[in-house]
Amino acid sequence: NILSLYTSHDTAATFIDKNNKVKVLEYERFVKQRYAAFTQTMSYREGLGTTDEQRESFLQYIKDNVKGEIKIIIISDPDVNDYDIIKSYFPEAEFHIIGHHDAHASSGYYTSNLKEASILSFDGGGYDATDGECYTRTYVGKGDNITIVKSYNYSLGIPYGHLASCIKEIKPGPDCDKHSLVYSGKIMGLCGYGNIRPEWIAAMTYYYTTMQQVSIPLNQLGESIGLNLDFNSIEGQDAYDLAATSQYVFEQRAFAILNEMLAQGTSKDIILVGGCALNVLFNQKLSQRLKDIGGTLTVPPYPNDCGLALGQFLSYTQKKTKVSAYAGFDILDRDKFDDYKEKYKATKCSISNLVDHIKDGKIIGILQGESEIGPRALGNRSIICDPSIKDMKDILNSKVKFREW
């Protein structure tokens, strides 16, 4: 049997379980720590590292649920410092390495119904066995094979997310104020309040071409457009317009990459993977453009790093594989259900009762079956409420989701 482990932030494991199901287990759900990393090389980013006790519990859970004996373990980083602890649970296993973007591409293509596709993998970067650090790459999938088309030495994810560090209204996550993993989603949400500033586009485009890991290009951008872009330095309409202009440039650069690939006669059926594939504003525009030329857009439910363990697994097996969007953990404390019923004086609730509660402004949590994989709630671990009720968005964000907007 094969075990695939992605051990950086958004750690996950993929294997075949005793019921012959493909499992994709997200570590953050197991340790109750958002973006949790199995590897302790991430401990320098506050809130991401985990303890040996947590790591051992996760490996034991895998060992208890995997089918047969693990002979192959797939990882993405040859510098991973976790060989010893992994090897102690699976002493007979050989280690194999699959590159970051190869895994992303595989997670999208091998789980799709497409016999041929053009693939764009783009994010904040990751290790590749041949190119070292790699940020953006295009591929062609055909039959059971995936072939690299072109690698790009710039990231769209890093400049997009890093821009949020200067906006006061965006609360950074706990991991690191300058490289917070929450930034990209929040600045995308802020775009709706802003307008594209045509006079900023040239400077923003230059920022995108130079920004990788350092803050100097952000300071240069601020000088070019007349804003102080230090940490938590701007707010209001300038901040909103900065977000909207950044979104515009992000989209133009992503379209340019795809147009370059399509100009070579590759398939008009596009698969997007990598963290940038969570940018639904871009995805909507791309979907319409592809529809106009007879193409389609596919984005798997797990395009970000939580899907890398699955991608590594599929890159190794190179087989089209049906993977349920509900391939995650079963309810981890199912055995305590009777205790909870007694403790909270639970009563059975019919569908009509639930509807009445929702109409009365209650917020309902849904917990059933095995969890979704990926960052989008799809009904098994979900929150539902009535959005037509005045201030419901603000109530939900303040009491449950703790979001700014």
What are these regions (language model features)?
Residues 2-35, 68, 80-93, 97-206, ...:
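Flexible beta->alpha loop and helix N-cap segments adjacent to enzyme active/binding sites
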Residues 22-45, 225-245:
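Gly-rich Lys/Arg/Thr-decorated short loops/hinges at beta-loop-alpha junctions or inter-strand turns
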Residues 30-66:
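N-terminal phosphate-binding loop and adjacent alpha-helix
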Residues 49-56, 96-100, 244-252, 348:
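Conserved phosphate-coordination/catalytic loops
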Residues 55-59, 102, 160-163, 250-258:
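Short, hydrophobic/amphipathic alpha-helical packing segments
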Residues 56-71, 258-266:
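Phosphate/pyrophosphate-binding loops at sites that engage ATP/ADP/AMP, CoA/4′-phosphopantetheine
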Residues 68-78, 267-275, 365:
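Short glycine-rich phosphate-binding loop at a beta-alpha junction
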Residues 174-268, 280-292, 321:
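A contiguous, well-structured pocket-lining segment that forms one wall/lid of small-molecule binding clefts
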